[in-house]
UniProtKB/Swiss-Prot annotation:
Gene assigned in the entry: tuf
Record's keyword terms, sorted: Cytoplasm, Elongation factor, GTP-binding, Hydrolase, Magnesium, Metal-binding, Nucleotide-binding, Protein biosynthesis
Chain intervals for the UniProt region annotation (G2): 63-67
Catalytic activity: GTP + H2O = GDP + phosphate + H(+)
Gene Ontology terms, MF aspect: GTP binding; GTPase activity; translation elongation factor activity
PROSITE patterns, per the entry: G_TR_1, G_TR_2
Protein's UniProt name: Elongation factor Tu
Length: 398
């Protein structure tokens, strides 16, 4: 059966849920899909239950390629792709790939707890990876009888957001109960609809980088028997069309060429994929083992693999979940670019003995294998699975 075409008539926006473990991110995601399916029944709006979204349980072995649930839904005004990023600290890596895919996010905070360590961490990560627009959903308000307590929690959340340069005083805070809405309580269903109209209004339609040269960070690779190899990910910038020639850049010294033979989004065929779309790209002339997560698909000649660069970095303080001790010259952490970790060594500027948690500094980095980078590429510095710094490439050296 031919796949149905993907409808482009509404503006498309990528959002997601972030926040502390057990504060109700996944329940809210389920509530949004379920309430929209009840109130605005369309072919896109299908209810998803908690279990089907919760695709990344904490007890599952790590090393799953990606543990982020993607759901789609629409309001009267827009089409949304929604990412549910798991809450546990072990999945911060995922938060980084997930948050990088959001035009805006709903920060879920349980009214019973208020902001918790991962609330802070996710706000910080959002700031680092360029998620500029946050809306707060204070969940579980049905469990709090004291109006003053709710006001205090809201103030605390707003202060925390301001601390990380978000407009804490001005951004929208919606109080509700995802579980009650999911169970069909009309009052709380109305609040979900209010939340979605706030998302429609407050998160601006993203400026898509469609005019720039194609860059698509590869998140996952699989092969379709008889058709070829598919690389999937979110198009960072540019467009990809059937018959385009692309280059596969990074990890390996050599740049490989391939031809695009198909583009799909949400299992529907597209004529072209645009910046911001989560797509699967079918490639001719590439074996399944010749392309991997961490590489990028790019317009030929637009980006090269590099191992040496200068970067401006901020090293997280102990309070932000960073290191407790300084590091010295030749420190060898992992550098997390787009979808993958690469080990590299850090050279400090002349005269700098060491870098303390909370410092920012210009460093020279040498990676153990090349990555597609350019001036302005952002990265995180990680060690043993936790983020200890964030940075941006200021100058390419080799």
């Amino acid at each position: 059966m031919a796949k149905e075409k993907y409808d482009r008539s509404k503006p498309h926006v990528n959002i997601g849920t972030i926040g502390h473990v057990d504060h109700g991110k996944t329940t809210l995601t389920a509530a949004i899909t379920t309430v929209l399916a009840r109130r605005l029944p369309t072919s896109v709006n299908q209810p998803k239950d908690y279990a089907s979204i919760d695709a990344a349980p904490e007890e599952r072995e790590r090393g799953i390629t990606i543990n982020t649930a993607h759901v789609e839904y629409e309001t009267e005004k827009r089409h949304y792709a929604h990412i549910d990023a798991p809450g546990h600290a072990d999945y911060v890596k995922n938060m980084i790939t997930g948050a990088a895919q959001m035009d805006g996010a709903i920060l879920v905070v349980a009214s019973t707890d208020g902001p918790m360590p991962q609330t802070r961490e996710h706000i910080l990560l959002s700031r680092q990876v360029g998620v500029k627009h946050l809306i707060v959903f204070m969940n579980k308000v049905d469990l709090v009888d004291d109006e003053e307590l709710l006001e205090l929690v809201e103030m605390e959340i707003r202060d925390l957001l301001s601390e990380y340069d978000f407009p804490g005083d001005d951004l929208p805070v919606i109080q509700g109960s995802a579980l009650k809405a999911l169970e069909g309580d009309e009052k709380y269903e109305d609040i979900i609809m209010e939340l979605m109209s706030t998302v429609d209004e407050y998160i601006p339609e993203p400026e898509r980088d469609t005019d720039k040269p194609l860059l698509l960070p590869v998140e996952d690779v699989f092969s379709i028997t008889g058709r070829g190899t598919v690389a999937s990910g979110r198009i960072d910038r540019g467009t990809v069309r059937v018959n385009d020639e692309v280059e596969i850049v990074g990890i390996k010294e050599d740049i490989q060429k391939a031809v695009v033979t198909g583009v799909e989004m949400f299992r529907k065929q597209l004529d072209e994929g645009l910046a911001g779309d989560n797509v699967g790209v079918l490639l001719r002339g590439v074996q399944r083992d010749e392309i991997e997560r961490g590489q990028v698909l790019a317009k030929p000649g637009s980006i090269n693999p590099h191992t040496k660069f200068k970067g401006e970095v901020y090293i997280l303080s102990k309070e932000e979940g960073g290191r407790h001790t300084p590091f010295f010259n030749n420190y060898r952490p992992q550098f997390y670019f787009r979808t993958t970790d690469v080990t590299g060594s850090i050279e400090l500027p002349a005269g700098t003995e060491m870098v303390m948690p909370g410092d920012n500094v210009t460093i020279e980095v040498e990676l153990i294998h090349p990555i597609a980078v350019e001036q302005g590429t952002t990265f995180s510095i990680r060690e043993g699975g936790r983020t200890v710094g964030s940075g941006i490439v200021s100058e390419i050296e080799a």
